[in-house]
Every structure is written in structure tokens, then in C-alpha cells.
Amino acid sequence: MATKLKVAVLGGGSFGTAIANIIACNQHQVYLWMRSGEQATASQLARENTRYLPGYRLHDDLMISADLAQAVRGAQLVFVSIPSHSFRAVVREARAYLDPGAMVISTAKGIEPEGFTLMSQILEQELPGHSIGVLSGPNFAKEIVQQQQTGSVIASESDALISCVQKTLCSSTFRVYANHDRYGVELGGALKNIYAIICGMAAALGAGHNTQAMLLTRSLAEMGRFAQLMGANPMTFLGLAGVGDLILTCTSDLSRNYRVGFALGQGKALDEIVANLGQVAEGVNTLRQVKQKADELGVYMPLVSGLYAVLFQGKAIHEVAARLMMGEQNHDVEFIKNRS
């Protein structure tokens, strides 16, 4: 290792813990910040995140603390792994301790509850002058700490940030690819949570492989259509942060959003499901935000509209599914159709 860095990871959830552990294994000085002092002390002593990643021993050199100043001061890299509803508040709190040259990376896959603001846009607003990046991809935290081979994407306008993150996280089991389409990478991570709910619901209702394949590919088409109108590169959605994350999240019960959909398909109430989940499922809030924005832009997103009708308008799942099958039959691969 050429240079030993100080790195802060803000957020004691499963993904923040997994990323911090990789960095500690790579012999950097890393602090994992948890809001709860009790949880931080227990995790530091047990060398285990008993709440979100029970059963997995953390590296002995990983420092776990509830002292935000201690974690952030002097850090060259700061990863923010905070749910969207409290992301801005934590960034504002950390701002006073950031070094002027610190590079800040969001790992959150959501949209701020009020207004269509992505997490890296919050970083830009709250931390002017800092290099900003997004880390996203098909990355279940449990499989990362199990040292399953995993690929992720770091997206930024800054080549220096991209290079630094790649070097800091690279290991024999974790590979980081580069992308300059930060907006597209971040949208992919947020949008796929909606479709994970849909696919989980379909699985609970006994959907066959044909149905699952159709849902996945039409989900990808909707994501690309929406993102292109929002200014992202639709080709980004053919990579790890797009179709890769979509496949992972829509086919596994390790996904919180998939589990929400599965429970909905079993007839359970949304409020009960969210209360019993124990962790944040970003897809429910993202659905509200994307439905509103799609209506404003006039984007054709039948799957988003259908799920919204089920969750918030009291429509029956079978009624919505039947309507979707009788809807507009459009082109299959739209970004190819539109090329001159």
C-alpha cells in the first residue's frame, strides 16, 4: 500500500459497516461512526455489528465511535452511508469537522423525501468546494463481509476521487469500476428499489419465469427512459449500477425492498410491513417521488403507476396487473430506436 489514509464512514448500518471493514482490511485508518453511543460501544467491544450484521467479526483495527468529530477530522475520504430521510442532517453536522480537501462519497440509494433531490446533490449543496462521488452497484453487505466476489461502481466528475476510491477499496474480493455519469449511477441505485417491490410482490403471487423476465426487462426500460429525460446517460443502465443492481435487488430476499413487495403480495398492510422490517426500505419513498416527477415530465412509466395505485390508491393487485397487460405495446429497446 503506497499511502495510508484516514477514512470516515458515517452510518452504522449493514453497508457502511461492510465498506468500513474492507478499508480496515486494506490497512487504512478507518472510523465507523454510529449515531447511537450504546451501539458504537457494544460493536467496538464485540468486534461485531450485532444489530445489522450479526455473526460477522470485524477487523481489529476498525475504530467504531459515536464521536462525529473524532471520526471526520483529518479524514481524506468520507463515505456517507445514511438513509435518505436523515442524510442532509448528518452531512450538516459533519460539515464543521471536514478538512477542506476531503472527498465525500454517498453510498445511499434513495431520494430526499421532500423534493426530487439525490444524495450527491445534497452533498453539493451542503459541501461546496468538495469533490463529490457516488458508490453504487449490486452490493449486498452480508455477501461483502462473507468475502463473496463483488463489483461496484464509483461515479464522479473527479478522476482523482475515482482513483482514490478504487485504490482504497480494491481487494481480491471487491472490485470497483469507474464511471463519470454520477447522476445516472445514482438514479440507477434509487430507481431499482421500486421495481424490487414489484418483483417481490409478483414472486409472492406465484409469478413464473416468463413473468419475472418480462418485469425485469420492462423495469430496465422504464429506468432508462426516465433517467434519459432527467439528463443521465441511458447506457449507464447497462452496467453494474443499472441492470446489475436491478437483477440483484429484484431476485433475492436479501433485498429489503423485495421483502416489502413479497409481504404485500401475501396481503399484509404496508404500515405493518415497514414497522416489522427493522431497516429502511427506500423504495416506498422513492416511488412517491418518481411518480410525481414522471407525471410532471410526462414520462410513460406503467410499472411505477401500477405500484403507486396498489400502495396509495387502494387498487387490487390483480386489477392493476390486468390493466398493465392491456396497455400500450411500445418498442422493446428504446434508446436504440431513437438513434439516427
Swiss-Prot record:
Active-site residues, Swiss-Prot/TrEMBL: 192
InterPro entries reported for this sequence: 6-PGluconate_DH-like_C_sf, 6PGD_dom2, G3P_DH_NAD-dep, G3P_DH_NAD-dep_C, G3P_DH_NAD-dep_N, NAD(P)-bd_dom_sf
GO cellular component, one term: cytosol
The protein's name in its UniProt record: Glycerol-3-phosphate dehydrogenase [NAD(P)+]
Transmembrane segments: none
Reactions accelerated catalytically: sn-glycerol 3-phosphate + NAD(+) = dihydroxyacetone phosphate + NADH + H(+); sn-glycerol 3-phosphate + NADP(+) = dihydroxyacetone phosphate + NADPH + H(+)
Pathway entry: Membrane lipid metabolism; glycerophospholipid metabolism
